[in-house]
Each structure stands twice: as structure tokens, then as C-alpha cells.
Regions:
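Extended hydrophobic/aromatic segments used for targeting, binding, or gating
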Residues: 151-173
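A phosphate-binding catalytic loop at a beta-strand-loop-alpha-helix junction
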Residues: 128-140
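Residue-level detector of flexible, active-site-proximal loop/helix-junction positions
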Residues: 17, 34, 72, 100-102, ...
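Thiolate-centered catalytic microenvironments shared by cysteine-dependent enzyme domains
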Residues: 1-60, 77, 137-159
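Structural recognition of the beta-strand scaffold that forms the well-ordered cores
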Residues: 64-67, 129-131, 154-155
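Short acidic capping loops at alpha-helix termini that bridge into adjacent secondary structure
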Residues: 9, 91-92, 124-127, 151-152
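Positively charged, proline/Ser/Thr-rich regional signature most characteristic
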Residues: 50, 55-125, 165, 169-173
């Protein structure tokens, strides 16, 4: 999401603090004193999708929509975590559960990333929009895709919370 607001110089601590500590790396309890800087956000609308854009894409098929939720929620066989949401998925979308690209809290290697997306029938050469339950784990898929060379992946940040809550949008099971 940093990139969606024009901040391209971003790093992710792969595996987080638990992996850092497990590797015996130094930590401190000192409070940092970062320098104050000005940042002017520039919204990159090419990296975001609205419900209307995703809905129009169902007919056009111009982009692959890849859902990061687990298979049960995607297929509509497990209940949604938010009350009142319909079950299922965006018509024509594919399912690559984000847990397939994370191992022990860290991103899997590049070969395994590619294999996970290909196993979900994602064509890595075609346009991609990621979705999930609320826009958070869609970012994990987008990061994984970035790591295999796709720096143009869009995120549907409304995701299933918006889609499943709107009766005017179609659902597949």
C-alpha cells in the first residue's frame, strides 16, 4: 500500500521480529528519534481497484482477480468472519490463499512463489488485481507477485467486505 501512495522506497522485514530474534540479531529497547521529513503522497490509481472497476472486469476479462482468502471462504463452504456477508467469491476470480506463500511467518522463495500462483491458474504475464477479506492479505499476494517481477499488480482494497456486503454485485460459489 505504500507504493499506492507513491512511496516506492520501502523494505519489509521478512519474517518479522520473531525471525530477527531467532537469528540472534540485535534488538534494543531504546526509543528511536527519527528525523522529521516531509512526504507528499501521490495516489497511484493504477494500483487500486474499486468495486465498479472489478464488476466491469467480469465482462471484459481484462484482469485476473486473485483472492487471498482460504479455500473454504472462497468456495462459500465456510462462514465469513464478518456477520451479514454473503458467501462465495467474485465471479471468474482465482484462489491463491495467502498462507500458501508464507512459511513460518516469512515469504517463501521465488520458485515456490511462482509455483503457488501457477497452481492457482494465475498467468503471471497478464494483468492482475488481488482481493481478500478486507484488503490486508491482498497486499501479501501483491508483495509476493512483486517479488516475482510484477510491480504493476492492483489491489481491490474493498475486497470481500465490500463485495459480499453489496446485494447488487454478483457472487459465485
Amino acid at each position: 500500500m505504500f507504493r499506492a501512495f507513491g512511496h516506492d522506497d520501502v523494505a519489509v522485514l521478512d519474517g518479522g521480529l520473531p525471525k530477527w530474534r531467532a537469528e540472534g540479531r540485535p534488538v534494543t529497547t531504546d526509543t528511536p528519534a527519527p528525523a522529521t521529513v516531509d512526504f507528499s503522497a501521490t495516489l497511484r490509481t493504477d494500483l487500486l481497484r474499486s468495486a465498479d472497476q472489478v464488476n466491469a472486469n467480469i465482462a471484459s476479462g481484462g484482469e485476473q482477480v486473485v483472492d487471498a482468502r482460504g479455500a473454504g471462504r472462497y468456495n462459500g463452504t465456510e462462514p465469513e468472519t464478518r456477520p451479514g456477508l454473503r458467501s462465495g467469491h467474485i465471479p471468474g476470480s482465482m484462489n491463491v490463499p495467502y498462507a500458501k506463500i508464507i512459511q513460518d511467518g516469512a515469504m517463501v522463495d521465488g520458485v515456490s512463489l511462482t509455483q503457488a500462483f501457477e497452481a492457482g491458474n494465475v498467468d503471471l504475464a497478464e494483468p492482475i488485481t488481488t482481493s481478500c477479506g478486507s484488503g490486508i492479505t491482498a497486499c501479501i499476494l501483491a508483495l509476493g507477485l512483486y517479488l516475482v517481477g510484477r510491480d504493476d499488480v492492483a489491489i481491490y482494497d474493498g475486497s470481500w467486505t465490500e463485495w459480499g456486503g453489496r446485494e447488487d454485485l454478483p457472487v459465485e460459489k
